Each structure stands twice: as C-alpha cells, then as structure tokens.
Amino acid sequence: MSSPEPPTEPPEPDNPTWSTQPTYSNLGQIRAHLLPSKACRLRTPGSLSTNPEPLPPPLPKKILTRTQSLPTRRTLHPSSIQVQPPRRPFLGSHSVDKSQAAVGPACLPAELTFGPADAPLGLSLRDLHSPEAVHTALAARQLQGLRTIYARLRARLMGGHPGPCHPGHSFRLLDSSPCAESGDALYYRVVRAHEDAWHILVAKVPKPGADVPHPWGLELQASLSPHFNLQGLCGLVPEGTLPGAPWRGAVALAAEVPERTVAQWLAEACTQPPEEFVWAVALLLLQLSAALKFLEAWGAALVELRPENLLLVAPRGCATTGPPRLLLTDFGRVCLQPPGPPGSPGPHAPQLGSLLRALLSLAAPSTTPLAAGLELLAAQLTRLRPSASRTRGALQALLWGPGPELRGRGAPLGPWLRALGPWLRVRRGLLVLRLAERAAGGEAPSLEDWLCCEYLAEATESSMGQALALLWD
C-alpha cells in the first residue's frame, strides 16, 4: 500500500514536534502481538488521548523476507534490524515462511553446483577445494582426450580400406612395370572399380624361382583383420581379367601400394646425420615389433626376418616428411608357433637383435642416449629373448621415456615404481598441449605423433616398469 506523501518541509533533526509533523506509526510497535502493518493516519496528540478511533481490522499475516547480499547471505530477524555501514548491494529476495526461516539457508556454498557452462568440468564446488579431486579429474580428462585423438588419427591413417573383391568388380592395369619389388614378389598397380567407387590396389606377383610359400601362413594372412603393420589382402585377380598383364594365373590383391623396401631405404637413409638415422631406425623397429606381437598373439612366428621383404608405404593423411609406414608382407615364411606360458622366450627376439645390430652398423657411431639404449636392447634381445610385446615397450621407453634417470642408481624398487604414475600423467598432458599447438597452426599430425599417442594411451605403471627393467636391470 502506498505511504502518505512526505511533508513539504523537513523537520529539524534535533527537536521533532508532534504538533507540526505528520507521524508514521506501525501497529506492530503499539501492539506486540501484531505483525508490521500499514502506517496510521495523521492525528494530533490531543485526539490520540481524548477520542481514539476504532482500530482497523487486522491485515493478512505477512511472511518474512530474506534478502541476499554479497558476499554472504543470512536471515534477518526483527531484533537485528539496524543500520550497519557500509551497505551491501541488494541482489534480490525470496520469501519463506516461519518454519523455513528457522531452518537456515537452503544449501551450503560447498554444495552448490555449476551451471550448464561448467558441466564439462565434472566437478562440484566442494571438489574445487580438494587438490586431489582436481588432479584426478584432470588426469582422467587428459587420458580420455588422448584416447580420442589416438582413435581419430588411427581412422585417418587406416581410412578408406577397400574391402574384399566381389564378382561385379572390374579391374584395369595402370602400369606395365612394377611399382615396387621385394625379395620374393613384384607389385603392379591395379584399379578396381564398381559403379562409381574405385580403389587403387596392387597385384602381388611371385617372382620366378622364389621359395614355395607356406600355405598356413597365406591362409593366416587372408583371414586377418586389418592391422596397421601387416599387409592385408583383398582377394584375387582371376586369370584373364587383365589382358596384357605380365604374369599368368590368378594373383593376390593387396590393399596398400608400397613405395620401396626397408633394404632400399637403408641405402639412402644411412647418409643422414647419425641422430636422425638412429631415430628413424627406432621408429621402424617399433612398427615391426607391433606386427610381430600380433603374430605371436595368434600363435604364429616368422621363420626368417629379411629387410627386403619389409615394405614401406606413405601413411595416409599425414605429413610427407614424417616416417613411413612399415608393412610385414612375408607371410609365406610364417609358421605355426603355439604361445608358451608367460615369461617364455620370444620366438622373434634373436632375429630382432641381429637386425638391430646390422642397422646400427650402417651409420656413423652416435653418442646419443637413444643410440646407447638401442645397443643395450640388441644385447638384451639375444641374452634374455623377451617377447615382441616387451620389446615394443622397451622401444617406446627409449623413444619417449621414461629414462634411467627416473630410477637412479641403487634406488629402491618401490619409490621408483610409484614415480611412474606422476610421470605418465605429466607426459600425457604435455603431449595433448603440443598436439593442440600444432593443430592451431594448421600443421598436420605425423605418424610419429600417432605412435606416441598409442604409447601414452595404453601405458601403465606396470608396463613401463617391465620395459625399464628389460633395459636397465
């Protein structure tokens, strides 16, 4: 209800007079049992005592009002209403009844939740006051982001797989000369078309006089799911489908078009600076160990590891200046090798050790930590004969850490293993930041970036501990 109009002239602050000034009174101050109500009408002092007017009917019961002020909020009681400078800005109000006013605030600040814009944090206000909760949430989000980056890069690198051949496909020979030559096969580029879709494949033609391939290995190659470091087959080119083809009979079709072999690459790469050559050798051996790990999991083993039967392919969707993609193609020398119990000698360790020593001998001696680690790994492969999985873990540790400095000489095993967890979380965060910086600059990721993502996304304290133990125990 609106209040009476204010007087035309303000009263003197020291001596207010009841006879000359209008009086604003509240029935709550006269009657304690009534809540605050409307102001009374003007009356003179005499009329108040001689002829009191009848009281108006009581107003409806009002409810208390709670105000919100910065930085805290509290319930204001009638006894505590007083002027306290400085005044806080009024933000708003909401009404509560007496029962709610006695309870207190609806929720504590520590129990407040964020708005929709803060939902990706996955944290409450109480979690922000706990460093452990913040660190745990950040570590989980970094790992999730790293796995997402790894999956997307893998889809880019392996995207566009042609799939198996069907009777409705047509074929056309692109070149009369081979695009690549391995130790026991020649590769010719072939176009496979069906309606509006087409793919460039390669016909794998055995060389005259080559060793008879093992049939079990060829059956295994035809049944394998796509793997980044194993040559995949798409079917056969029927005899007579390609008139003028420089071969006879049906030949296998492979999905990836090779550029050269590892033996041909070595003839050119050994002229690079020693540091660059050693790094490239480690990346190639890492991919080879991934292929051998897959074979060992299937109960198979490669009888003879020859650089001329290891093909190199340009990875899809990556920078052309990065390392090439390695393909294991010699399935004709793959035989059945049932896996033994955990810790049994790896069937490929001696061959990997010999190949590593041969590769390191082609370049000038290097004093880098990576070169020293590779020489040590070559000796451990011959002496301990680890599995391809452990060899792959050791190569990952040599390329991206952690190094032997994390453990220290003579350090107890327990603190050393506990330090691997924080190291792994920091390393993941740094990799995500580096990839984000490069993506912001428009730089395409390389095959090396994907291999590093694969390592940090899969690594655990246990796997890193086994890799370091293989290298430096």
UniProtKB/Swiss-Prot annotation:
<dbReference type="GO" id="GO:0005925">
    <property type="term" value="C:focal adhesion"/>
</dbReference>
<feature type="region of interest" description="Disordered">
    <location>
        <begin position="42"/>
        <end position="61"/>
    </location>
</feature>
<feature type="compositionally biased region" description="Pro residues">
    <location>
        <begin position="1"/>
        <end position="14"/>
    </location>
</feature>
<comment type="similarity">
    <text>Belongs to the protein kinase superfamily.</text>
</comment>
<dbReference type="GO" id="GO:0008360">
    <property type="term" value="P:regulation of cell shape"/>
</dbReference>
<comment type="function">
    <text>Probable catalytically inactive kinase. Interacts with CRK-II and antagonizes CRK-II-signaling. Prevents the formation of CRK-II-dependent membrane ruffling and lamellipodia-like extensions.</text>
</comment>
<dbReference type="GO" id="GO:0004672">
    <property type="term" value="F:protein kinase activity"/>
</dbReference>
<dbReference type="InterPro" id="IPR051511">
    <property type="entry name" value="MitoQC_Scaffold_Kinases"/>
</dbReference>
<comment type="subunit">
    <text>Homodimerizes. Interacts with CRK isoform CRK-II; the interaction requires PEAK3 homodimerization.</text>
</comment>
<dbReference type="GO" id="GO:0015629">
    <property type="term" value="C:actin cytoskeleton"/>
</dbReference>
<dbReference type="GO" id="GO:2000145">
    <property type="term" value="P:regulation of cell motility"/>
</dbReference>
<protein>
    <recommendedName>
        <fullName>Protein PEAK3</fullName>
    </recommendedName>
</protein>
<dbReference type="GO" id="GO:0032956">
    <property type="term" value="P:regulation of actin cytoskeleton organization"/>
</dbReference>
<feature type="region of interest" description="Disordered">
    <location>
        <begin position="1"/>
        <end position="27"/>
    </location>
</feature>
<feature type="compositionally biased region" description="Polar residues">
    <location>
        <begin position="16"/>
        <end position="27"/>
    </location>
</feature>
